[in-house]
Amino acid sequence: MKRFKINIEYMVDKVLYKTNVFETEHFNIKYTALESHIKLDVTPLVPLEKVTFKMTVPYDFRSNDRIFLNGYQSWTECREHFVDDEPITLNLKQQALRLIKPTSPYGDYDFVKYDRRKGCFHGFSYGYVRNIDHFDFFGSLSERFGYTIIRANVPDREIIFERDLEGVTIKNEYTLIDVIHYKGEENQVYDKYFETMNIQKPRVGRTNGYTTWYNYYQNITEDIVTTDLESLSKVDSKIDIFQIDDGYETFVGDWLDPNPAKFPDGMKAVAQRIHDKGYMAGIWIAPF
């Protein structure tokens, strides 16, 4: 991955600038570029607004390659693609429906530009190109500065890394990209990625849980939760976790904004009642 190029756009004093260099009168970029790791940090000399950034790496795709890119969230369809597949996107009818019903809770349609050409795919944080048992694995080491969007662009024979910087004004040193490229068999590349990120192997034992979803779906209230909690506590349920599922929030996605009409005492009070019964309290915040 030593060979790469960058493109950065930004505004200073309402003037738009576009460049592909590492130093201007407005910023300088320091970088680490190794075969398996690239990191780019920008130091602004003035506040940088409306920044967009991408880094492009050449890649020789082969006809029997398979491409996987991690989805935006758990509702995103994630699978391996053939190099000549069409990207998964909205058709014309679905795009028209977006004018009536926003799609923001269901995917990245509102903030990621889709390339509709065959062989053009995108995902978030990590992905790979697989040829039989050999994996070329690409992964971000940090998403604290914004989502890392990875694009596999087969027609142009390149892999592109972007940082989601919408709404960000860069005033201090900022990590534009921090990605690795590991090669090997599946377990090798994933184990090395987890090791690099210091992610320990989970050591959680088996647990049993109750969720409101399959009885009530979104039609839950504080009274319903309290009634079920009382009922469970009177039987030998062997339940470890009592989970409040979808329906407590005002709208899908607003998980920090409980519906006061349905949960007048608030979620903290409900969680305390769950704890008082000896259960761990769970709450649904999917699709993330």
What positions do the PLM features span?
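Carbohydrate-recognition beta-sandwich/jelly-roll modules
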Residues: 1-241
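Aromatic-lined carbohydrate-binding/catalytic grooves of carbohydrate-active enzymes
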Residues: 206-288
